[in-house]
Structure formats: C-alpha cells, structure tokens
C-alpha cells in the first residue's frame, strides 16, 4: 500500500513535512540490485505521473521534493507536493507513482471535505490520540477500508510482530515460549 494523499492539521504540518522529506530524499532510485525505489511498470506510466505532477504545478501546486522529470526510462525520484488543488488529476486520481501530496487543514470539517473531494479512496488511515475522534471522522469519509493509528503508544498491546519496543523485544518475550 502506498499513500498518495496526506491531509494534515496545520500545527504538525512542518514537523511532518520535514520528517517525510528527510526520509524520501535519501532513497536510492534505480537498479533493483542497489536501489530502494525501482522503476514504474512502464515508461508510459512514468510519463503519465510526470504529466500529472506538471499539471498540478501549473495549477499552483508547489513541488517540495522532486524535479518533475524522469530519472530514467521508467524511473521517477520521489516527489512531495503541497497546495494541490482538488480539481487536478493528481488529487482526483491515483498516480501510482512515487508522489505524495500533502494538504494542510485547520479543521476536521475541512479535512473531511478534502478527503471526499476525490472519488478514489480504497484505503484511508487516521493518526490521532483520540480513538473516538477517529471513529467520528471515519463515519464521514468515504473509503473502502479504514485503519486507525492511535498515537503515541500509550497502551500495553503489541503492534504487529515487532511490538512497542522492536523485534528484539518480541523475540525474547517470555510469553512467546
């Protein structure tokens, strides 16, 4: 699963943008033997993604990361865009490329409106400290599947096989025996 659109509240936007940009800017793009991000399926796919990014940029979006050109026949470096208008193809459709759109909102109502501005939403997730808020928001957003991530870890349960403290803790947990 790859995230295409992230709707984030203004108070945490800069911190999130900085963390995502730092992670994506270090990815090695290219040959699958040495890369962390390989090619798109075809060169046509890459051309389509580049066209969607260019269209969003021409409509006023700002490219925070990425150079809006191919790094090889079907290769694209990761892109981050902000200010993408909901009427653009990049917001309305899935790009199926290494493109992340960040949208800043001030209210939950604004987030719901933006999330519902696209007819495509196979999977959605909500990261919050308030599970009741997550359920309320999920009831208002059209999506096929929902994931709730309650942050920060404040409960005694384990998440996936790695748990709260990493795989080493899971491997040595006496409850596994």
What are the residue ranges of the model-derived segments?
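Juxtamembrane/interface motifs at transmembrane-helix termini
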Residues: 4, 35-37, 54, 132-135, ...
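NAD(P)-dependent aldehyde/semialdehyde dehydrogenase
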Residues: 10-120
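Structured core elements
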Residues: 7, 62-65, 125, 147
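Conserved C-terminal structural/oligomerization subdomain of aldehyde/semialdehyde dehydrogenase
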Residues: 75-177
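Active-site PLP-lysine loop of aminotransferase-like
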Residues: 1-8
